[in-house]
Amino acid sequence: MIGLVGKKLGMSRIFTKEGSSIPITVIQIQENRITQIRNIKTDKYYAIQVTTGLKKLNRLKKPESGHFLKSGVIPGRGLWEFRINNNEKFQIGQSIKINIFNDIKKVDVTGISKGKGFSGTVKRWNFRTQDATHGNSLSHRVPGSIGQNQTPGRVFKGKKMAGHLGNNRVTVQNLNIVKIDQNRNLLLVKGAVPGPTGSDLIVKPAIKI
């Protein structure tokens, strides 16, 4: 399913005629340029590869430079792929714009969530804290027991423990499109999306309507 790559500009709110406030995220979607078309014969699947934005030539690595030179497309800030059906017709260098969402009411937005670093179980998994008093002097935020006894004699995989929090690929589904600003290439969706301001987002039509 084809989508578009955009940039998160931040959050705001708009008011309805009745005066109620709607929290929105503003996503800037510049034109996506097709750099490569994958087919079943050479790649075993159908997809289009796109780029967006601009990147200075002296910032490109040699493989990237050669790839953009071969396709004849202006270098962008990254490369993304969207699976397609074989009956869909696309050409290298073709631009895909925000108007593909004109008839869409809901979208799925994918991004990289904010990294929180190494976090304990209270923050990472919402564990409850232990007693502040009643003889507890050192174990206020510790997770407690992580196993049983000689049997099974190990810690089960997937045990909720302290560790790295955030910086994961996250998809938020079924976000309502509030407004599309064609002139400024802005997509306004209701609610929050993953990642910090300025991060790249993948926006696709919702699959679970």
Curated annotation (Swiss-Prot):
Post-translation changes: Methylated by PrmB.
A GO MF term: structural constituent of ribosome
Entry-linked SUPFAM superfamilies: Translation proteins (SSF50447)
Function (record text): One of the primary rRNA binding proteins, it binds directly near the 3'-end of the 23S rRNA, where it nucleates assembly of the 50S subunit.
Xref: InterPro entries: Ribosomal_uL3, Ribosomal_uL3_bac/org-type, Ribosomal_uL3_CS, Transl_B-barrel_sf
Segments forming a coiled coil: none
Superkingdom of origin organism: Bacteria
Modified residues (N5-methylglutamine): Q150
Cross-referenced NCBIfam families: L3_bact (TIGR03625)
GO cellular component, one term: cytosolic large ribosomal subunit
Subunit: Part of the 50S ribosomal subunit. Forms a cluster with proteins L14 and L19.
Pfam family, one: Ribosomal_L3
Listed name of the protein: Large ribosomal subunit protein uL3
Protein family per UniProt: Belongs to the universal ribosomal protein uL3 family.
Record key words, sorted: Methylation, Ribonucleoprotein, Ribosomal protein, RNA-binding, rRNA-binding
A biological process term (GO) from this entry: translation
